[in-house]
């Protein structure tokens, strides 16, 4: 049996841009992608801490070191600049893998710079 498990999480990042007329997606600073082990075009689930919205889209790379978290297309209706988000990726794992798996959690500062990387639960 396969279980769908939390793989990685960007915790409480701040939305820096929302562009309704872009094709779609979520732009994420490459430093954050590397820290979380996330990849461009990977499906993500987003949880808006500010307004309670939950939605999904896919990742595109934003400039390294920019602190950018940009919501594009329809996703731009789900959050405003300044909102706090939790961004998660999930993946299938065997029973054996899931028994010992620890998701990667990236905590950020107010400028969306990596503050701490840890395995969850701490």
UniProtKB/Swiss-Prot annotation:
GO biological process, one term: alanine biosynthetic process
Names of required cofactors: pyruvate
Catalytic reaction(s) noted: L-aspartate + H(+) = beta-alanine + CO2
Residue numbers annotated as active site: 25, 58
Sorted UniProt keywords: Autocatalytic cleavage, Cytoplasm, Decarboxylase, Lyase, Pantothenate biosynthesis, Pyruvate, Schiff base, Zymogen
Keyword set includes Nuclease: no
Co-factor binding details: Binds 1 pyruvoyl group covalently per subunit.
GO molecular function list: aspartate 1-decarboxylase activity
E.C. numbers: 4.1.1.11
Family listed: Belongs to the PanD family.
Function: Catalyzes the pyruvoyl-dependent decarboxylation of aspartate to produce beta-alanine.
Protein name listed in UniProt: Aspartate 1-decarboxylase
Organism: Bordetella parapertussis (strain 12822 / ATCC BAA-587 / NCTC 13253)
């Amino acid at each position: 049996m396969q279980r769908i498990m939390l793989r990685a999480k960007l915790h409480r990042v701040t939305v820096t841009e929302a562009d309704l007329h872009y094709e779609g997606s979520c732009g994420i600073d490459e430093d954050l992608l590397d820290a979380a082990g996330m990849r461009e075009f990977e499906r993500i689930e987003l949880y808006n801490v500010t307004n309670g919205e939950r939605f999904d889209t896919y990742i595109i790379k934003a400039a390294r070191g920019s602190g950018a978290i940009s919501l594009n297309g329809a996703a731009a209706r789900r959050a405003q600049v300044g909102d706090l988000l939790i961004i998660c990726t999930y993946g299938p794992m065997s029973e054996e893998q899931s028994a010992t798996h620890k998701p990667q959690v990236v905590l950020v500062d107010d400028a969306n710079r990596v503050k701490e990387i840890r395995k969850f639960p701490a």
